[in-house]
Amino acid sequence: MSGNTYGKLFTVTTAGESHGPALVAIVDGCPPGLELSLDDLQRDLDRRKPGTSRHTTQRQEADEVEILSGVFEGRTTGCPIGLLIRNTDQKSKDYSAIKDLFRPAHADYTYHHKYGLRDYRGGGRSSARETAMRVAAGAIAKKYLATLGIQVRGYMSQLGPIEIPFKTWDSVEQNAFFSPDPDNVPELEAYMDQLRRDQDSVGAKITVVAEGVPPGLGEPIFDRLDAELAHALMSINAVKGVEIGAGFASVAQRGTEHRDELTPQGFLSNNAGGILGGISSGQPIVAHLALKPTSSITTPGRSIDVNGEAVDVITKGRHDPCVGIRATPIAEAMMAIVLLDHLLRHRAQNADVQVTTPVLGQL
């Protein structure tokens, strides 16, 4: 199966299925000498792992990562970094009833037509279980970016119809929703409790921000930084839309409002989301991603079987009623992977470029 590797100089390849024995990743291109420990990776994996609250799937996976190669005496060697996470809580029997059926809004139907067969257990390769390896790889990228003063972090900005105002980063790690507003957490909890009683699911919006990114990252035309970010973020399971900066709100803006004017003291706004002409401007890079409602719900849905006969499908098993609740670390990981890849590409081509024009921040 192609399409399992992302990046050009900093590359991430993942493999593994939801109910297989393990998930694996190969991270290649990480510069040598970076101090790296299991704790660096486990910290983000624990933020993503299932079963951490009543609002997520109750599948219990420790998601304990093993580093198989590429690290010696606590430092990266420059060789490929092999990573492994063992699956320990599969319940494949939950899916035996749907092995010949197609769940609505899942990848069952499309995988069947593409490959002629599919791993029906928990969605197989199409499951968001795969994103655990992205988070592990992204933790490596985040660690390297941090040595250059670049910080990547995210938060939930909307849960279903509830918009979440940004108040403080301090709140994000203090609740199960990654909400930046501590005051609205009870409302989010009540909404999810009712959703569970209704046996339904809901979507979410995640915002991810990179600060400290220098100007100059990104390539013209096809490898624009915003295009690469959209590619990476859209590759996350359940993501149906990506915005950079003001995004679709730009449609209603006038040019006098949308343009980010420059002054000697800094930019006056950041509607561009930190990217101009596909190249980073030095402002914070801001992206938003929309995740659809979970398709695995117990309410019967109309579908067909492999013979084309009409059936009603009820999805059993353990599922997230809102995949967006655990998506923040995944979005951070993908943004970090993109930024490190482009940082290394920029360094390879333009390391000798010197510009006397000052780097502007945002007022």
Swiss-Prot record:
Annotated FMN binding sites: R125, S126, S127, N237, A238, G277, K292, P293, T294, S295, S296, R318
Superkingdom classification of source: Bacteria
InterPro entries named among the record's database cross-references: Chorismate_synth, Chorismate_synth_AroC_sf, Chorismate_synthase_CS
Alphabetized UniProt keyword annotations: Amino-acid biosynthesis, Aromatic amino acid biosynthesis, FAD, Flavoprotein, FMN, Lyase, NADP
Molecular-function GO terms, alphabetical: chorismate synthase activity; FMN binding
Residues making up the signal peptide according to the UniProt record: none
Keyword Iron: no
Functional summary from the UniProt entry: This reaction introduces a second double bond into the aromatic ring system.
Subunit structure and binding partners: Homotetramer.
Similarity section: Belongs to the chorismate synthase family.
The protein's name: Chorismate synthase
Organism of provenance: Stutzerimonas stutzeri (strain A1501)
